A protein has these predicted regions:
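A solvent-exposed, acidic/Ser-Thr-rich amphipathic alpha-helical stretch
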Residues: 5, 24-27, 31-75
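A beta-strand edge to alpha-helix "cap/lid" segment located at domain peripheries
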Residues: 2-3, 55-142
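Short, low-complexity N-terminal intrinsically disordered segments enriched in polar/charged residues
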Residues: 1-28, 133-142
């Protein structure tokens, strides 16, 4: 199996862990000194902290969808485009599009992952003319 295919399989494994709420190898997937940056500011250092976050978050929410749209590979990096939807224990629903920028080490472990989010509820503020009309609702956190 080629390197790109192996990386894609590992990304699918990571997304499946969240969908199934089951750790099937976080400490093997991420390096001991991995850095994981969420799109809304939290940053985790080390595979142990990433596992702690995964275990704790899974008690507060359920990911309903994390669909992969496409991958881009260059050298030791992969970018994956995805669509995400989760429901928190309090009933709050979050749904957005995103990208993950991933760097791999020589052993095909993730050593860096940074997420970028984009509100899926987009609009054109200039649809009615040259003066922008913005929505009254609060935008998502990213």
């Amino acid at each position: 199996m080629g390197t790109e295919r192996q990386r894609e399989n590992k990304i699918r494994q990571w997304f499946s862990m969240w969908l199934d709420k089951q750790d099937t190898g976080i400490e093997e997937l991420f390096t001991p000194d991995a850095v994981y940056i969420e799109s809304w500011e939290p940053e985790y250092h080390g595979n142990g902290k990433i596992k702690l976050w995964f275990d704790e978050w899974s008690t507060r929410g359920t990911i309903e969808r994390w669909d992969i749209r496409q991958y881009f590979h260059k050298g030791d990096q992969t970018v994956v485009e995805w669509a995400f939807r989760c429901v928190m224990a309090d009933g709050t629903v979050q749904s957005f599009d995103g990208l993950s920028l991933i760097r791999w080490n020589e052993a095909s472990q993730i050593c860096f992952l940074q997420e970028f989010g984009c509100n899926e509820n987009r609009y054109d503020p200039y649809a009615q003319g040259n003066t922008p009309v913005f929505r009254e609702e609060q935008a998502l956190w990213f």
